[in-house]
Amino acid sequence: MVALMIGETGFFQKVFRAFPNSFTEMLSTQFEHSEWHGLTFWDVILPAFMTMAGTAMALSYKKQRDSGYTWKQSFLKVLKRSFWLLFLGILIYSVRDGHLNWQLSNVLTQLAFTTLIAFSVINQPVWFQFTVTILCLLIPEILYRSIHIPGFDQPFVEFHNFGSYINKSLGIHVDILHKTNFINFISSGAHTTWGLMAGQLLFSDKTSNRKFIYLLSAGVLFISTGLALDLTSITPMLKWISTSSFVLVTGGITLIVLGICYEWIDVRNHKNRLKFFTIVGMNSIFIYLFFIFIGDKWLNGYMEILCSELLNFANVPLAAGAAISCIIVFLMEWYLCYYLYKKKIFFKL
């Protein structure tokens, strides 16, 4: 969430404009989505968010069961949460570029559906859960490759694939900057379900060493399989339509990071060193809505003008002032999370 928060200010792009060199260009590129084929750091954020949501679901469900909740009661809570995720996901992008925008492909709307997929198998054995994730990957592959609609019969070409046809049929606004397909939630369901499985593993009675090995092994296997699919041109790695190779690689990366974090934080007990990050994570939904609703639409631009113009009086270049404004916005947003943390105010769906 901290990376997402700093990235949403446009900090790395503004640093590149202020200090153009190969290093800042690399950072700027990594904090932008790939144009079509390939993978950047920024592309991994959404899959990581969805995977961690599955892990959090495992913890929440365990606490509910310990408190005497039935499956039906837990399901109703999940259903309510999915409704609010869907509502907020539509609301935050309902007005864009000066007109109404019907959007069903951002992280909140996608998570609304993947949450239901993961919860549907929460009481099933591991082999069944894993089989469902494989189906999540195979179903889009079959749909994209086997359905041939004139103008939408090229499975891995932007705007000419089956997912684009569904977008058009539903009246979803798509352009060169916003070309994510609604049906991505099918393959992304694997992310949230893998997160659920990882969470159940972490809360099991297996040894910490075995948990660490399982997470790393699964991560390496997923990355290897995804890269093989991409490098052999069987299925290219495409973030925008969430191909199976993309889901496997990003899911694998997230599981490895989760395993390393578990080993370093929980097993080796370094929890106190991460307070800066956990303060943001404890209000992740709130701060996400804040920097989309307020940051993107007003605060970022306002602070850029204010800082760059004022600092220019001290002979600081406008581009450098714009980069500094991003740091100020980031610190303001972090302090807002800190204030909520100190007041014990946590926004949950």
Question: PLM ranges: what are they?
Answer:
Residues 1-349:
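Alpha-helical transmembrane segments and their immediate juxtamembrane cytosolic regions
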